[in-house]
């Protein structure tokens, strides 16, 4: 069984036991997070498609880690003008482990 959930403006295909990195959530390591914006549920030969979300379906996940991605270097340059700007950015993320998928009745 798998589900497609929406969080942080992105969509993720999840199943029980899978881990995923999502945009940073306000939760501590070890906390349980409920993702209730389920777009699609697939099990055996049956598929439930939400309009836009599947009513009553949710994913229960545990926060495994709060961290940042590796640094991305941004370098701006204009030739002949001696203009150079260099800066870096590290995007924060939350790593989740899926514990349970709750289906609608």
UniProtKB/Swiss-Prot annotation:
Transmembrane segments: none
One annotated Gene Ontology cellular component of this protein: cytoplasm
Disulfide cysteine pairs (residue numbers): none
Domain of life: Bacteria
UniProt keywords, alphabetically: Ribonucleoprotein, Ribosomal protein, RNA-binding, rRNA-binding
Role noted for this protein: This protein binds to 23S rRNA in the presence of protein L20.
Record note on quaternary structure: Part of the 50S ribosomal subunit. Contacts protein L20.
Protein name as catalogued: Large ribosomal subunit protein bL21
């Amino acid at each position: 069984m798998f589900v497609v959930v929406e969080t942080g403006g992105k969509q993720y295909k999840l199943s029980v036991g899978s881990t995923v990195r999502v945009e940073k959530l306000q939760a501590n390591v070890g906390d349980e997070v409920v993702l209730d914006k389920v777009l699609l549920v697939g099990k055996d030969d049956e598929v439930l498609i939400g309009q836009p979300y599947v009513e009553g379906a949710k994913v229960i996940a545990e926060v495994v880690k709060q961290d940042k991605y590796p640094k991305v270097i941004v370098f701006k340059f204009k030739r002949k003008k001696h203009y150079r700007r260099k800066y870096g950015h590290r995007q924060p993320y939350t790593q989740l482990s899926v514990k349970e998928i709750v289906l609608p009745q």
